[in-house]
């Protein structure tokens, strides 16, 4: 049907969603010369996929930019379903994402958020409280970056003024996230790969190379520290764990190579930074567009915490309306609207259709979250819908799957969930937020720009005033 380039642009998931009325809940696309693609667009078809065919569609397609420096070979997110994927997922879960480990690193997140709040205040003061506002997302991203950096390396990577490596690493990660999210004609027409028409492979080679180079320097520095007996930590960080790893059987490597450690570390940054900052930016945007919801969540935080106490992670469970705001934001603005693509590992019969091995599978979480069959007034921002609902984002309710479901859902969800709520709550507790003088709630630009996540195309500018 039509022209495949009609689906290009910054929000292909919206255009694909429009086809559901005509073609039904499952869409079959032949993209380019060789890419068979199945798109899932309803909660029922997603339930069938994740409940009954999860293993059959558990591989990942490898796109051209992920070939840079052989990144895909050590990646947990892109690994074929099998022993390496199970091993890498297990080690990251145990060392970063179980509740015990998350609770042990509470102070790291508190310090990173405290620094973010100070930077927000200093930036607002240096602009003279001017009417243009500040791009608060920059500081949220920095906070997320340093939270992850401290859990891996036990140090700030960017806010440390002496860390040139940290700044270079930060810039390399920004580049990798951008190039990974740009549609690449080389993936549609493999015969064009050798020409690198858009220059994406060259850019990814540059930034991935820099990211791996700096990570390897961090690893070498740590090995030297350990040899000299310097900086012994009471709690091991992820880098220590990866260096010390010893396999326990035939399904695990005896030791992790430097390159394997490097890719695991890069992946933790890619997965753990932009998702948090982008989600909090969208949530703050929606509250500024809906002043009554803003007043309601601010009042809840004030009543639970009070004006003179810091917002802490232990407060999150006592703030149901704030949690509802973030769920509603994730329903309307899932970080990865089409999730991470899957691939059929074998010929499969799915809901009456014969799906060939190698077919790419996209799950349109954006369309599912706005489906009127499951949601009343689906295009309205209405956090109250979650106050009496048990629907959650943890992969069991298929009408709300911003982080995926099944075996390959986001492994970092427990930590990401904590980071997102803590960052958001701290910003609301510390400041009152206003729009620049020339911007009204209804005039806020709501367009998305695709990178690794669907972030705001026009970054949110706001004026923070001490609460």
Swiss-Prot record:
Its cofactor is heme. The keyword Iron applies. It is an enzyme of class 1 (oxidoreductase). CDD domains: CYP76-like (cd11073). Pfam families: p450. InterPro entries: Cyt_P450 (IPR001128), Cyt_P450_CS (IPR017972), Cyt_P450_E_grp-I (IPR002401), Cyt_P450_sf (IPR036396). Its EC number is 1.14.-.-. Gene3D superfamilies: Cytochrome P450 (1.10.630.10). GO terms for molecular function: heme binding; iron ion binding; monooxygenase activity; oxidoreductase activity, acting on paired donors, with incorporation or reduction of molecular oxygen. Coiled coil: none annotated. PROSITE patterns: CYTOCHROME_P450. Heme binds at residue 410. Keywords: Heme, Iron, Metal-binding, Monooxygenase, Oxidoreductase. Belongs to the cytochrome P450 family. This is Cytochrome P450 76A1. It comes from Solanum melongena (Eggplant).
């Amino acid at each position: 049907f039509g022209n495949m380039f009609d689906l290009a642009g910054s929000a292909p998931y919206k255009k694909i969603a429009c086809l559901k009325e005509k073609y039904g809940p499952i869409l079959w696309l032949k993209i380019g010369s060789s890419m068979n693609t199945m798109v899932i667009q309803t909660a029922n078809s997603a339930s069938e996929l994740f409940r009954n065919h999860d293993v059959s569609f558990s591989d990942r397609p490898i796109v051209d930019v992920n070939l840079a420096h052989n990144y895909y070979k050590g990646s947990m997110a892109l690994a074929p379903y099998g022993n390496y994927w199970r091993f890498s997922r297990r080690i990251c879960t145990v060392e970063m994402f179980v509740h015990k480990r998350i609770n042990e690193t509470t102070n790291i997140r508190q310090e990173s958020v405290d620094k973010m709040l100070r930077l927000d205040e200093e930036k607002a003061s240096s602009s003279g409280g001017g009417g243009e506002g500040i791009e608060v997302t920059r500081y949220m991203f920095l906070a997320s970056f340093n939270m992850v950096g401290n859990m891996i390396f036990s140090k700030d990577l960017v806010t440390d003024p002496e860390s040139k490596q940290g700044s270079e690493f930060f810039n390399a990660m920004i580049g990798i996230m951008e190039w990974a999210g740009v549609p690449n004609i080389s993936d549609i027409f493999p015969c064009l790969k050798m020409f690198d028409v858009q220059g994406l492979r060259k850019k990814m080679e540059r930034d991935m190379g820099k990211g791996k180079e700096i990570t390897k320097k961090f690893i070498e520095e740590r090995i030297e520290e350990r040899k000299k007996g310097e900086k012994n930590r009471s709690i091991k960080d992820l880098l220590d764990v990866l260096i010390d790893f010893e396999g326990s059987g035939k399904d695990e490597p005896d030791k992790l190579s430097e390159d394997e450690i490097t890719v695991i570390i890069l992946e933790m940054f890619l997965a753990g930074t932009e998702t948090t900052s982008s989600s909090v930016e969208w949530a703050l945007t929606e509250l500024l567009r809906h002043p009554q919801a803003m007043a309601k969540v601010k009042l809840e935080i004030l009543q639970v915490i009070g004006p003179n106490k810091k917002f802490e992670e232990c407060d999150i469970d006592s703030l149901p309306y704030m949690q509802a705001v973030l769920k509603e934001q994730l329903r309307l603005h899932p970080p990865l609207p089409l999730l991470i693509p899957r691939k059929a590992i074998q010929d499969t019969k799915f809901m009456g259709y014969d799906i060939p091995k190698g077919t790419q599978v996209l799950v349109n979480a954006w369309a599912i979250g706005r489906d009127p069959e499951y949601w009343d007034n689906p295009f309205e921002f209405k956090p109250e819908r979650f106050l009496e609902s048990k629907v959650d984002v943890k992969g069991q309710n298929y009408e709300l799957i911003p982080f995926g479901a099944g075996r390959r859902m986001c492994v970092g969800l427990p930590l990401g969930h904590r980071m997102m709520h803590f960052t958001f709550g701290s910003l609301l507790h510390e400041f009152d937020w206003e729009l620049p003088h020339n911007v009204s709630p209804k005039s806020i630009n709501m367009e998305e720009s695709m990178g690794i996540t669907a972030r705001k195309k026009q970054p949110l500018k706001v004026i923070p005033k001490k609460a």
